[in-house]
């Protein structure tokens, strides 16, 4: 996501050996719109609520053709352009789930990942967490007799399924 690519850029620029893991298949985090319920993403009409001038990275301005309040497509393109411009793709392992990070007695980190149903364990001297904390919904249990449809915002992708319905 956006925090991960800036961390990769800044750490690699000072000469550190960087390895990143991303559950998605490309750079963009939640800004990659996808209708699959398993994918945490923005919904189809999302625009950022801050202006592009306040939201851009200081070393990589938005294209002048981008809307003042960019859409999710414009943001995804921006983050992918940033990653290409600074050659960050080489550091990222896509389609990889970070399952566990454990600090060891020698202050190193044991990181367990999974890619294509294959688990891998590696040890690192340092750990930077730029996790997508919105990827797995937290659904509280409510007491009562509600018999309607209950969905988490994680599954909300577009408004059309709710047309002519009463929604709370």
Predicted segments — roles?
Residues 1-20:
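N-terminal Rossmann-like FAD-binding beta1-loop-alpha1 element of flavoenzymes
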Residues 3, 25-27, 37-38, 60-62, ...:
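Short, solvent-exposed loop/turn segments at secondary-structure junctions
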Residues 16, 23-26, 30-81:
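Glycine-rich active-site loop/strand segments that organize a redox cofactor
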Residues 20, 54, 92, 148-151:
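Conserved beta-strand scaffold positions in the cores of enzyme catalytic domains, especially
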Residues 30-34, 106, 140:
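Short aromatic-enriched loop/helix-cap "lid" or pocket-rim segments at secondary-structure transitions
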Residues 31, 57, 79, 111, ...:
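Structural signal for hydrophobic/aromatic residues that build the beta-strand cores
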Residues 65-67, 71-75, 129-168:
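Glycine-rich dinucleotide-binding loop and its adjacent helix/turn
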Residues 65-135:
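Feature captures the FAD/FMN-dependent oxidoreductase FAD-binding
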């Amino acid at each position: 996501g956006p925090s991960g690519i800036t961390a990769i850029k800044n750490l690699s620029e000072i000469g550190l050996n960087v390895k990143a893991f991303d559950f998605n298949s490309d750079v963009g985090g939640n800004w990659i719109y996808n209708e699959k319920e398993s994918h945490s993403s923005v919904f189809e009409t999302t625009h950022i609520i801050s202006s592009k001038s306040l939201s851009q990275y200081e070393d990589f301005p938005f294209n002048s053709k981008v809307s003042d309040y960019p859409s999710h497509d414009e943001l995804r393109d921006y983050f992918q352009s940033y990653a290409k411009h600074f050659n960050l793709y080489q550091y990222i392992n896509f389609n990889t789930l970070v399952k566990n990070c454990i600090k060891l007695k020698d202050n190193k980190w044991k990181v367990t990942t999974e890619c294509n149903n294959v688990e891998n364990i590696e040890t690192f001297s340092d750990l930077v967490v730029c996790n997508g904390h919105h990827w797995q919904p937290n659904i509280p249990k409510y007491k009562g007799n509600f018999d309607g449809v209950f969905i988490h915002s994680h599954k909300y992708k577009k408004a059309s399924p709710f047309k002519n319905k009463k929604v709370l």
